[in-house]
Amino acid sequence: LPIGITTSLKGTLMAIFDARYDSSRDLQGDIDIAMMRSLDGGMSWQPMQIVLDRKKWGGLPEKYNGISDACILTDEKNGTIYVAGLWMYGVLDPRSGKWVEGMTQDSTRWIHQWHAKGSQPGLGVKETCQFLITKSVDDGLTWSDPVNITAQTKKPEWWLYAPAPGHGITLKDG
């Protein structure tokens, strides 16, 4: 099931969802934000494309660079499509809340940001999930490099940061 759906100003239907490769569990894991486009109101769909993927960022395998809980919206003024998601880098120790060094593809440690000390106060990638946003100006065919807007949207003293997935809104005043 899609997490979010929007219709572009050109009438293209876009559905976004988590592409979970290794398991059905939530972050942390090898998860990307994927999208499918329909040009005929949902009767048929183009192949899945990946919209947000951190790959092996920071030297960690993809299973420790997961992105989940996407939100999509169409800017009704200029037609730009935005997709945002939560990126979790590495793993925090559930007892100490400290970032675990040396994670590899063979590592089996896992903690969800909502459990124990899986998320911490602060803004850094080794403290808390990061809020990333990408945009498309060509009706969802291509996407910009992700921009990290965590420092603009999360207060450093917050422990847990989890903007909800779904469909975003635009306001008349911007």
Task: Walk through the language-model features, giving the residues of each.
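Asp-box/BNR beta-propeller blade signature and adjacent active/binding-site loops
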Residues: L1-G174
